[in-house]
Amino acid sequence: MYCIGLMSGTSVDGIDAALVNISGKDLDLHIELIAGATYPYPPALREKIIAVSEGVSLSMVELAQLDDAIATQFALAAQKIQKGHPQAELIGSHGQTIYHRPPKIKRGEFSQTDLGYSLQLGRGEVITDLTGIPTVSKFRIADIAAGGQGAPLVPKVDAYLLSHPTQTRCIQNIGGIGNVTYLPPRNQENWESHVYGWDTGPGNVLIDLAVQKLTNGQKTYDENGEWAAQGKPSQDLVTKWLQYDFFYQAPPKSTGRELFGHEYLDKCWTDAIALQLPPEDFLASLVELTVASIIHNYRAFLPQMPQAVLLCGGGSHNLYLKQRLQENLGHQSQVLTTDEVGINGDYKEAITFAVLAYWRKICSFPGNLPQVTGASKPMLLGDIHLPISQI
């Protein structure tokens, strides 16, 4: 079955689209990437999404308009990705997160008022209507209803795409926010029950915001990490910035621009100004914060350090970040990209939501891992929207 996965993360770079051919059932799947592309948001829409994600209030009319505008962009991405390719029969659309609130109390101890909440805009109903293709959306809310974080949702797919027979691996996504999937070797007894995952902290978000600030909006990211590579990180500042409750919170945990956005960057910027750091040192320090937060999470919360760390997401192209991660991990872990083991790192999350949609509609197979999200039980993820021709 040809399926389209659509994803836009906290970087709000645009909509990642993946057209994949999926066959099989449940965990016995064959997945082939046919095409992948990223379709940038119109600049004004991107700015509005970022503002709302960081707490700017909207009227109900404005929220509805934003919801429809995002859905339209997702539908256009689905239409574009399949041009020249076989007709897709299913779309899995994550939508655009504009608000994420983790649950207040650990699983088993909460009341209904303590449940988390996560809002993704880009209604599946609109995507179905514009494309004529069945669409699965709203993947996170079922896990949240069962007491989970609603995130991360990629680990179950990671486990069957990227686990190794004998090697312990971490799949480290570096989007706007960083998240890790810990994969024990498949030769370990009951290995699936020892797959873990959580958000590690800032990925690219602070680096990108800093580049925009330093260039007055002329640039949106540091290509290949070349600017930061010219600088020297301030270890004193990195140590100070790491004294943030989220980094020491045990999993399950998730975060977003609510914690690591403009407000957090402004604090970092004030610290850098006090030390008279040049721009390249400031950027190098923010890269070091991402690296240090990843390694802190590994050492504090993993059962053991991984033999390999596989990077994906936009940050996998930041060669300076990759270098610093390898230098800080030392010889105990080899840092690679998922591309180097056969999975396109730019579209891995889009592929994930195609698989989650396939599991939901075709297999009626749970897509979450309770030990990852903190949910009380496995859940079917996503709402199914059918075109009128299939009702």
UniProtKB/Swiss-Prot annotation:
Keywords: ATP-binding, Carbohydrate metabolism, Kinase, Nucleotide-binding, Transferase. Pathway: Amino-sugar metabolism; 1,6-anhydro-N-acetylmuramate degradation; Cell wall biogenesis; peptidoglycan recycling. ATP binds at residues 9-16. One of its GO terms (biological process) is peptidoglycan turnover. GO terms for molecular function: ATP binding; kinase activity; phosphotransferase activity, alcohol group as acceptor. It comes from the Bacteria. Its EC number is 2.7.1.170. Signal peptide: none annotated. InterPro entries: Anhydro_N_Ac-Mur_kinase, ATPase_NBD. It catalyses: 1,6-anhydro-N-acetyl-beta-muramate + ATP + H2O = N-acetyl-D-muramate 6-phosphate + ADP + H(+). Pfam families: AnmK. It is an enzyme of class 2 (transferase). PANTHER family: ANHYDRO-N-ACETYLMURAMIC ACID KINASE. Belongs to the anhydro-N-acetylmuramic acid kinase family. Catalyzes the specific phosphorylation of 1,6-anhydro-N-acetylmuramic acid (anhMurNAc) with the simultaneous cleavage of the 1,6-anhydro ring, generating MurNAc-6-P. Is required for the utilization of anhMurNAc either imported from the medium or derived from its own cell wall murein, and thus plays a role in cell wall recycling. This is Anhydro-N-acetylmuramic acid kinase.
